[in-house]
Amino acid sequence: MKILVIGDLHGEKPVVRTRGFDCIVCVGDICGDKKISKLYKEWFKYKKKNPEDSLDVDEFFLSIGYGEKKIKKLEAESLRTGKKILKYLSSFGRPIFLVPGNWDQSYGESRIKDMTKSEYNYFKVWLDRFNGNEINPKLIKGLRNIFDCQFEMHNFMGVNFIGYGLSCANENPVTSLDKESFSKKEFDLLKNSYNKIVDRLINSYGDKNNKLPCVFISHNVPYNIKLDVIKEKNSFAYGKHLGSSVSRVFCLRRKPDLCLAGHIHEGKGKCVLGKTLVVNPGYGKEAKVLIDFDEVSGKVRGVNFL
């Protein structure tokens, strides 16, 4: 089986020059984010300078001239960009296995209204978001050959494809950069929420046909490997690991043959975690990898960064 892996596009249409593949895998962040991400960068900059200010993100956007209608317009534009890309990929007539990224507007809902109130609120909201059920229906409605792998397993050519998207950071409070700020009660609640996500993914794989070769699609690369180290010197997390603990646990427990992941743009490359080969195709329209995968043995015969 030849698998064409598409990296984090962020609204950039990929250039597919080869036709020699059986299926396509998208690791998420298909939608465009350039306009929206600028607003969030301004918000984070503001909060860094004014940590005690009670202004929430919506109020901040409004203060700089972006009310709810303008934000929704930007989000709709982002989704349209993502759908055009998926329509293009669908035109090749091959099955597309994908998970939502953190920019694909597919987050789960949270009961917490003000995520800026405390470190606990902030962490809990993200765990709730990572537990989203599916990719945004507006992205894939009317398109053929699309298989949403978010907590779902699909089989193609005798190979299991299962995924976990949305994650953009380490979900485990035990190894969190903010763990010292949680009370004992908060820590226990966060650990419980984290364990629920892990159990949901593990149980989604189940026992049926789990002896078949398996390809695990994760938006974020597994935590604490060479591909999840932040290399941007201006980042608050420079030199630290920001991969997904959930994905790491899945790889070590279920031992998929192949993990295809992204999110960490500077983490392009491959490495081994336990018995799993992890491949990150990188960022942008040229971020593509062609993988030669033996659908009988589960062995990876070749990894070609295009």
Label for each model-derived stretch:
Residues 1-4, 144, 153-163, 211-215, ...:
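Beta-strand-turn-beta hairpins that frame and shape the catalytic cleft
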Residues 5, 62-84, 131-132, 182-198, ...:
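Soluble or luminal CAZymes and related metallo-dependent hydrolases
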Residues 5-8, 24-29, 73, 96-102, ...:
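Active-site neighborhood of phospho(di)ester-bond hydrolases with catalytic His/Asp-centered motifs
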Residues 9-11, 30-35, 100, 104-240:
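Conserved catalytic scaffold of divalent metal-dependent phosphoesterases
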Residues 11-156, 281, 285:
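Core catalytic region of metal-dependent phosphoesterases/phosphodiesterases
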Residues 44-46, 50-51, 57-79, 212-255:
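Active-site-proximal segments of metal-dependent phosphoesterases and phosphodiesterases across multiple
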Residues 87-93, 208-209, 251-254, 272-273:
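Short, conserved loop/helix-junction motifs that constitute active-site signature segments
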Residues 97-99, 118-122, 228-296:
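Conserved beta-sheet core of the metallophosphoesterase superfamily
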